[in-house]
Amino acid sequence: MVDGWIILDKPLELGSTQGVAAVKRNLRQAGYGKCKVGHGGTLDPLATGVLPIAVGEATKLCGRMLDASKVYAFTVAFGTETDSLDLEGGIVATSDVRPPLADVHVTLGAFRDSIDQVPPAYSALMVEGRRAYDLARAGETVELPSRRVTIHALTLDSWTGSEGAVETATLTAHVSKGTYIRSLARDIARALGTVGHVTMLRRLKAGPFAIEQAISLDKLNALGQGAPLEHVLLPLEAGLVDIPALDLDPEQARAVRQGRVLTGLPFEDGLYWARLGTVPVALVELSDGNLKVSRGFNLQDVAE
C-alpha cells in the first residue's frame, strides 16, 4: 500500500486530471498495483507549478488542500483583454492606456483585502448542471455571481515598459480558496483604467506544499522505469505540517481508531492531527477537552 503525496511541478498544457493519470500509470508500472489517487486543487492547463497529488490514505486530505490558501506568480499584459482572460482566448477589448508605475503600486494596495470577485466565464464552475467553460466555448453567455475572496498579499516583482507607461507587470499573490488569478488580473487592469490578461501563471504554493518540494514530469516518469519511490513520495503527514500534532498513547490511539470520543484532554480547541509515535492516526477536532475524529487514517503501523 502506498500512502502519501507526490507534488508535481505541472508543466504547461498538462491538465490536472492528466497529472493524476500520470501518477497512477507510473505507480502501476513500478509494481504498486492499483492505487487510489486524487489531486488537491485544479490548476489551469496554461498554468504551471505546484499540483499536490494524494495517494492512498492521503486522498482523505484532498478536501483540506482545496480549502487551503495558494500563492501564485503571474504576469499581466495591459492593453488587451481576452474572453478567457489568458493567452488562449480571443480578444474582446483593447485599450491604448498604459498605467504609470506609481498608479500600479497604489492600486495593488487597494486589492490587499477581502474583495468581491466574478469568476471567469472560462472556469470549471457549474451552471445549471454544465461547466461554465463548456457554455462559453459553445458561444453562450455565461453570468456567474461574484464571490468573496481574500487577497492576503500582493506584490509587484518586475515590470516592463516605462515608469510612465507600464506594459506588463509580474506579481506574486497569496490568496484564499476560490480566488481566480485571471479575474484578479482583469480587475487590477480595469481599476487602472485599462484592460489586461494573464500571460504567465505559476503556482508557487498550495497549502503546506511549496514549489521547492515539487518534482518534474520527467522525474515522475523515472518512477515507472525503476527509480525508488522515496525519490518522489512525501509522507502523508507532509500535508498536515500546517496544523499542530497531538500525541496519543497506544490506548488512546486504539480508541480513536474505533471512533470513540476522548474526553478531558488538556489542549486548546481546534484542529489537530493525532499520532502514535510518528504515525498519523486521525485528523481530529478538539472542543472543551473532547476529541472527535474528522478523518481516520488506516495506516498499518498504528498500534492495535
From Swiss-Prot:
Please list the reactions this protein catalyses.
uridine(55) in tRNA = pseudouridine(55) in tRNA
- Gene3D superfamilies listed in its UniProt record: Pseudouridine synthase (3.30.2350.10)
Q: State which Enzyme Commission number(s) the record gives.
A: 5.4.99.25
What GO molecular function annotation could you give as one example from this UniProt entry?
Answer: tRNA pseudouridine(55) synthase activity
Please name the InterPro entries in this protein's record.
PsdUridine_synth_cat_dom_sf, PsdUridine_synth_N, tRNA_psdUridine_synth_TruB, TruB_C
Q: Name one GO biological process term.
A: tRNA pseudouridine synthesis
> Carries keyword Transport?
no
Could you list this entry's UniProt keywords, alphabetically sorted. Answer: Isomerase, tRNA processing
Q: Where is the active site?
A: 44 (nucleophile)
| Enzyme class of the recorded protein, top EC level | isomerase
Superkingdom as given in the UniProt entry: Bacteria
Q: What does this protein do?
A: Responsible for synthesis of pseudouridine from uracil-55 in the psi GC loop of transfer RNAs.
Q: Which family does the similarity line name?
A: Belongs to the pseudouridine synthase TruB family. Type 1 subfamily.
The molecule here is called: tRNA pseudouridine synthase B
Q: Name the species this protein comes from.
A: Novosphingobium aromaticivorans (strain ATCC 700278 / DSM 12444 / CCUG 56034 / CIP 105152 / NBRC 16084 / F199)
Query: Lineage, please?
Result: Bacteria, Pseudomonadati, Pseudomonadota, Alphaproteobacteria, Sphingomonadales
